[in-house]
A protein has these predicted regions:
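N-terminal signal-anchor module of multipass membrane proteins
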Residues: 1-84, 95-108
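Hydrophobic alpha-helical transmembrane segments of multi-pass membrane proteins
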Residues: 28-35, 145, 149, 170, ...
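Membrane-embedded alpha-helical modules
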Residues: 112-219, 340-390
Length: 390
C-alpha cells in the first residue's frame, strides 16, 4: 500500500479530526458543493414524473434526495470504502428513468404510479450492484486496470461534467465568471491571508457571488426574467418541517423492461465510481484503493441505491465527483468532515425552509462552481500519468 498523505500537503488528512466548529463549517461546504447536482436531478425529473405543476410535492422529493444522500454517505464513510466521499444522486440514471416515465402504459396515470415503477427498477438494479460488489467481480477486474486506464477515465469524467456546469454559468457569464474567479482567488492566491479563506474557498465564493447577485436584484438591475435574479418566493412558500419515510409514494412496481433499462445506468455509475475512488484517495492522502476497498465501496453504493429506491428519490446514489474536487481545492481530506456533512444533509432534509433558501442561489453561480470543481477533477485524473513508466 502507498500512503499519499505526505505528498498532498493536506491541512487535514483522512483520519484527522478538525475542531468541532471547523468540522461543521467544512461539512456545510460539502453540502453546498453537492447541493446543485442533487437539486438538479428532481428538477429535471419533474416534467417526466408529472410534478411540474406540484411545487409542494416537488419540494418533498428534493428533501428526500438530501435525506437519503446523508444516510448513504454515512454508511459509505463508516462501513463502506471509508473514503471521504459524498454519496448522492447520479445523472447516469436520468435517461433510463425518463424512458420508464415515458412508457405507453404510464401515459395517463398519476405521478405516484410513475414513481413506483422507477422505484421498482432502482431496487431491482441495486440487488445487481450489491451482488457485483459482494462476489468481488468488480475487484477482480482491477488487475487489468492501471494508471494509464484510470487517468483518462477520471479526466473524461471531469470533462464530461462540463456539459452541466458550463451551460449554467453561460446563462450569465458575468456572475458565473465571477464565481470561477473567486474560487481560484480564494483557493490559490488569497489562502495565505486568513485561515478561513484557506479552509472555505468554495463557500466564500458562493456567498460573495450570491451577495452580488442579490444587490443587483435589489437595485433593479436584474429583473425577474434574468438568470441571476435572486428571489425569496420559494422560501416564503415552503413548509417548515417534513420527515421523509420509506414507501411514502406507495408500493414499488417491478417490471423486466424497466429493470433492463436501468442496468445501463448502474453499469455507468459503477465505472465512474471506481475512478472516483482513486481520485478521492489521491486527494485525501488515503492508501491507493485495493480490490477489497473497491468491492466494499460498490457493495455499499448498491445498498445506498436500495435505500433510495425504498424512500423514493426517483434516482440512485453514487460517488460525487464535485465533492472530490472540493477536497483538492480546500486540502481537507478528513473523513470526519464528510460525515459531518452527511449529518447536515439528514437534518436539513427535514427542514424544508433551509433547502428552499438555497434554491434561491442563481444558476450561473452554481454553474461557475461546477466549472472550477470539474477542472480540478480533470487535473487529478491527468496527474495519475506520473505513475506510468514510459
Amino acid at each position: 500500500m502507498v500512503n499519499q498523505n505526505k505528498n498532498n500537503n493536506l491541512l487535514y488528512g483522512i483520519d484527522d479530526k478538525p475542531p468541532m466548529v471547523e468540522t461543521v463549517v467544512l461539512g456545510l461546504q460539502h453540502y453546498l458543493t453537492m447541493f446543485g447536482s442533487t437539486l438538479a436531478i428532481p428538477l429535471i425529473l419533474s416534467k417526466p414524473l408529472g410534478l411540474e405543476d406540484k411545487p409542494v410535492e416537488l419540494g418533498w422529493l428534493i428533501a428526500t434526495m438530501f435525506f437519503v444522500s446523508g444516510i448513504t454517505t454515512l454508511l459509505q464513510t463508516t462501513w463502506g470504502n471509508r473514503l471521504p466521499i459524498v454519496q448522492g444522486g447520479t445523472f447516469s440514471f436520468l435517461a433510463p428513468t425518463i424512458a420508464i416515465c415515458g412508457m405507453a402504459a404510464l401515459n395517463n396515470v398519476g405521478w405516484e404510479v410513475r414513481m413506483q415503477h422507477v422505484q421498482g427498477a432502482i431496487i431491482a438494479g441495486s440487488v445487481f450492484e450489491i451482488g457485483i460488489g459482494v462476489t468481488g467481480l468488480v475487484g477482480k477486474l482491477l488487475r487489468f486496470v492501471g494508471p494509464i486506464t484510470i487517468a483518462p477515465t477520471i479526466a473524461l469524467i471531469g470533462l464530461a461534467l462540463f456539459k452541466f456546469g458550463a451551460p449554467m454559468a453561460g446563462t450569465h457569464w458575468p456572475i458565473g465568471g465571477l464565481t470561477i474567479i473567486l474560487i481560484i482567488l480564494f483557493s490559490q492566491y488569497l489562502k495565505s491571508w486568513y485561515r478561513s479563506i484557506e479552509l472555505y474557498p468554495i463557500l466564500l465564493a458562493i456567498l460573495t457571488a450570491w451577495a452580488v447577485a442579490a444587490i443587483f436584484t435589489i437595485l433593479g438591475v436584474f429583473t425577474e426574467s434574468h438568470p441571476s435574479f435572486t428571489s425569496m418566493e420559494n422560501l416564503k412558500n415552503a413548509p417548515w418541517f417534513r420527515v421523509p419515510y420509506p414507501l411514502q409514494w406507495g408500493i414499488p412496481q417491478f417490471g423486466i423492461a424497466a429493470f433492463v433499462g436501468m442496468l445501463a445506468g448502474y453499469i455507468a455509475s459503477i465505472v465512474e465510481s471506481i475512478g472516483d475512488y482513486y481520485a478521492c484517495a489521491r486527494l485525501s492522502g488515503a492508501e491507493i484503493p485495493n480490490e477489497r476497498t473497491i468491492n466494499r465501496g460498490i457493495t455499499f453504493e448498491g445498498i445506498g441505491c436500495f435505500i433510495a429506491g425504498i424512500f423514493g428519490t426517483g434516482n440512485g446514489t453514487t460517488s460525487y465527483s464535485e465533492n472530490i474536487g472540493a477536497i483538492g481545492l480546500t486540502r481537507v481530506g478528513s473523513r470526519r468532515v464528510v460525515q459531518a456533512g452527511a449529518i447536515i444533509m439528514i437534518l436539513l432534509g427535514t427542514v424544508s425552509k433551509f433547502g428552499a433558501l438555497f434554491t434561491t442561489i442563481p444558476s450561473p453561480i452554481v454553474g461557475g462552481m461546477y466549472c472550477a470543481m470539474f477542472g480540478m477533477i480533470t487535473a487529478v485524473g491527468l496527474s495519475n500519468l506520473q505513475f506510468v513508466d514510459l
